[in-house]
Amino acid sequence: KGDTGWLIIDPLTGEETSRLAMELVKKHLGDHPVKAVILSHSHIDHFGGIFGVASREDIESGKIDVYAPEGFFDHSISENVMAGNAMSRRATYMYGNLLQKGTKGSYGSGLGTTSADATPGIIEPTYLISDREGETKTIDGIKVEFIYTPESEAPAEMMFYFPEFKAMCQSENISHTLHNLY
């Protein structure tokens, strides 16, 4: 939480699931407005839930800022819309979406329990991060050090560090699953 509201990182895959997550946050952590959203990279499971945490109107008016790596929108469209049908068919096999749930069918996708069945959304970011040497922004009172890492785990990707909290989000650049190899 920032000085006046929430800073959301990667709002899940779809609007319905991210909206339910925000309801839990408000119930247990306080009903504060969303001030900014950080989209770490161009894979739909990290940005598709944008409209569950922020409205298009609030983003377009500048009420809520959206930070993403340079190339985010174009790479998201090319991978998730233009290649979406092929990727969806691949996911059916890869995640076992058509298998019966349970120990004799599917009990997980490897990355999680299953892929989301929710409405994805996308919007052009209001701020693009493009400096490979790093750039620092203060978002609602929170200092964030961004590092642009294109063509890593995704075509458009970035990592970021919160020095006040000694916390780093490496997106999916540092991962033990090597999930893009299968």
Where are these regions (language model features)?
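Core dinuclear metal-dependent hydrolase active-site scaffold
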Residues: 1, 128-167, 174
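Conserved beta-strand hairpin/beta-sheet module of binuclear metal-dependent hydrolase folds
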Residues: 1-29, 157-172
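Active-site environment of divalent metal-dependent phosphoester hydrolases
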Residues: 42-48, 73-75, 153-155, 175-178
